[in-house]
């Protein structure tokens, strides 16, 4: 029976990490809902406020690498606690900022602290959940998507009640602090609770220091070998760049596409608001997709094939999105959200599989930077293509990107038994390709 159910400790890890995922995506999605109001209040151009957002998003991606290192060194729960408190306090600072520069600095801090979650939270799950890890990743994905889904409504409700965009950040920051206290006080065996003294002394996480390799770690290298790099992991990281382009591009330009191609939105008195609501509704299907993506990984024998299946379906969907309008466009977009968002839990599952236990944090940090940091170039590319050729052509371009992602995903499967062995012999670093 223990094979089929998570232990109490595992469920504690899953819900704590997933709760952090919820608040992280909630904080990072609030901006799009209140951007117009902020720009008007501070007499800022959309270009200026867009640059502030770009800095925040870049730090959101870039911070994942050092966050991954810190999670490996000090323990996932400690670093995750810092992230939750940091992003919550930063949200309060955003709500209390008056003027362009205070807002820019506080939003940059928000992006930086939000970057901590993915490497630390996913490492927390990868190390703390031994069975049915796919289900755990699925729950984590669902809560993150739920945060994205509810953030615009939270912002709208706060503005309606308190007549200020600041209330959205202040209320979210206060809620985040409450969750941070819960995270800090909840005991997890094998994980250190947050302590300035422990971190100052450079203590390693007890569980990571005491543990050997898990059942999915690559075999240890013998002799003079100093490291192993699975070929599949290289292709997984490359796939993250391509999928990050798809994620940021589709999420950013759906409202513009709907304003242009959906008649009832085009003719509405408030097309921006209506396009935002429709985008939010379509993201709801991503909740189902994220759950299914985690669920299916515990059921299939070859999880490496699942991302390829996702992109095989998504590629023609992008082409159809670029060609259709009105009800057909809405229906196809819903299917896209349902299918595409099942990719992320599987990707996380595979990154955990192909990285050693002691380096889970760094592995997720690199993956997160590639996904959200480099993938964010989609906003610039999408803006150029939309200005020059129309937003529908940008979705045609993403069909091509998706086709390339499909080939990369297939490469993961066909190289899963190959690895590069690095060794140092008499001071000289050498490498060779080896089949397991």
Summary of predicted features, one role per range:
Residues 29, 57-65, 148-149, 283-291, ...:
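Residue-level signature of mid-helix packing/kink "hotspots" within the transmembrane helices
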Residues 31-32, 231-287:
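Extracytoplasmic gate region of multi-pass secondary transporters
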Residues 43, 75, 96-101, 130, ...:
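Helix-breaking motifs and short loop linkers at transmembrane-helix boundaries and internal kinks
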Residues 62-99:
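Conserved MFS/SLC helix-loop-helix module at the cytosolic interface between two early adjacent transmembrane helices
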Residues 106-144:
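Cytoplasmic helix-loop-helix junction between adjacent transmembrane helices
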Residues 143-192:
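Helix-loop-helix hairpin linking two adjacent transmembrane segments in secondary transporters
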Residues 300-347:
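C-terminal transmembrane helical hairpin of 12-TM major facilitator-type secondary transporters
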Residues 354-389:
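A late C-terminal transmembrane helix in Major Facilitator Superfamily
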């Amino acid at each position: 029976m223990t094979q089929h159910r998570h232990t109490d400790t595992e469920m504690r890890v899953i819900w704590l990490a997933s709760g952090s995922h919820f608040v992280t995506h909630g904080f990072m999605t609030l901006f799009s809902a209140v951007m117009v109001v902020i720009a008007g209040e501070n007499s800022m151009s959309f270009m200026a406020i867009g640059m502030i957002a770009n800095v925040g998003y870049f730090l959101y991606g870039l911070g994942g690498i050092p966050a991954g290192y810190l999670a490996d060194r000090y323990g996932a729960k400690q670093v995750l606690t810092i992230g939750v408190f940091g992003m919550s306090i930063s949200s309060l600072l955003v709500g209390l900022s008056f003027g362009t520069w205070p807002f820019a600095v506080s939003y940059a801090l928000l992006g930086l602290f939000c970057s901590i979650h993915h490497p630390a939270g996913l490492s927390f799950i990868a190390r703390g959940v031994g069975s049915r890890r796919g289900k755990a990743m699925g729950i984590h994905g669902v809560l993150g998507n739920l945060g994205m889904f509810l953030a615009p409504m939270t912002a709208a409700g706060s503005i309606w009640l308190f007549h200020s965009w600041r209330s959205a950040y202040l209320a979210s920051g206060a809620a985040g602090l409450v969750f941070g206290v819960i995270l800090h006080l909840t005991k997890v065996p094998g994980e250190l609770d947050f302590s300035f003294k422990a971190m100052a002394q450079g203590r390693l996480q007890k569980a990571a220091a005491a543990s050997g390799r898990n059942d999915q770690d690559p075999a240890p290298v013998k002799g003079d070998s100093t490291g192993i790099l699975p070929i599949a992991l290289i292709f997984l990281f490359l796939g993250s760049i391509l999928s990050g382009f798809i994620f940021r591009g589709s999420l950013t330009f759906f409202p513009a596409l709907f304003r242009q191609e959906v008649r009832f939105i085009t003719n509405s008195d408030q097309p921006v608001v209506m396009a935002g609501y429709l985008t939010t509704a379509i993201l709801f299907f991503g909740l189902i997709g994220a759950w299914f993506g985690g669920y299916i990984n515990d059921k299939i024998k070859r999880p490496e094939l699942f991302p390829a299946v996702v992109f095989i379906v998504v590629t023609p969907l992008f082409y159809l999105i670029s060609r259709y309008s009105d009800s057909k466009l809405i229906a196809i977009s819903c299917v896209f959200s349902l299918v595409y968002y099942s990719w992320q839990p599987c990707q996380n599952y595979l990154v955990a599989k192909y990285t050693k236990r002691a380096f889970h944090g760094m592995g997720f940090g690199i993956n997160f930077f590639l996904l959200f940091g480099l993938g964010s170039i989609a906003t610039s590319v999408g803006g150029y293509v939309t200005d020059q050729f129309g937003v529908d052509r940008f979705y045609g371009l993403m069909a091509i990107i998706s086709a390339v992602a499909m080939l990369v995903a297939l490469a993961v499967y066909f190289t899963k038994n190959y690895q590069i062995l690095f060794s140092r012999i008499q001071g000289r670093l050498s490498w060779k390709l080896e089949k397991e």
